[in-house]
């Protein structure tokens, strides 16, 4: 979800999304605002849409729906700066936050170590975030690390909400595979 684009986020919730990833959350105050905007009363102040896909398009009382949706919908905050990592414990302590997700690519960029996902400073950031998440009963998450040597390191540390890849990369790999196959069928047409 684009940072701060709550209208888009709530539209996604109304249309059946069971979680929202909000990027660049650097402080507990920002995390509280995310919860306030994405959780339904009494936890937050997200507006309840009408009859939606969560209930098979059947009606449900707003109280029943709010409680069920607050329990089912994941509120995922991305920690993508050294400031966010320094504030990880305070962010994790915010009620209604379900997942702390390190955006490793942006974190590396902010640290001045673009693409160095195995750097010890990044590992330290994961240790900090995972400890904070565990202390407050949240899921520690990892995004942006798809290297099959580095990814297991952070999973072994305790990352449990793991983005295993990107849709665009999966599509590009599939397209490259198919293109290679087609070129083999018609070697003279390259």
Predicted regions and their residues:
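Expand to "…catalyze enediolate/carbanion chemistry for C-C bond making/breaking, isomerization
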Residues: 1-190
């Amino acid at each position: 979800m684009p940072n701060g684009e709550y209208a888009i986020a709530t539209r996604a919730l109304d249309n059946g999304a069971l979680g929202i990833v909000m990027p660049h959350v650097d402080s507990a105050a920002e995390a509280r605002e995310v919860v306030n905007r994405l959780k339904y009363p009494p936890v937050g102040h997200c507006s309840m849409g009408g009859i939606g896909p969560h209930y098979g398009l059947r009606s449900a009382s707003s109280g029943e729906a709010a409680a069920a949706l607050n329990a089912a919908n994941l509120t995922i905050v991305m920690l993508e700066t050294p400031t966010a990592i320094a504030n990880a414990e305070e962010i994790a302590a915010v009620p209604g936050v379900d997942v702390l997700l390190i955006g490793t690519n942006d974190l590396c960029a902010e640290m001045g170590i673009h693409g160095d996902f195995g750097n010890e400073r990044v590992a330290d950031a994961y240790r900090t975030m995972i400890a904070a998440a565990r202390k407050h009963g949240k899921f520690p998450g990892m995004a942006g690390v798809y290297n099959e040597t580095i990814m297991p390191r952070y999973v072994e540390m305790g990352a449990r909400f793991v983005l295993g890849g990107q849709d665009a990369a999966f599509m590009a790999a599939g397209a490259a595979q198919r293109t290679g196959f087609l070129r083999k069928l018609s070697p003279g047409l390259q």
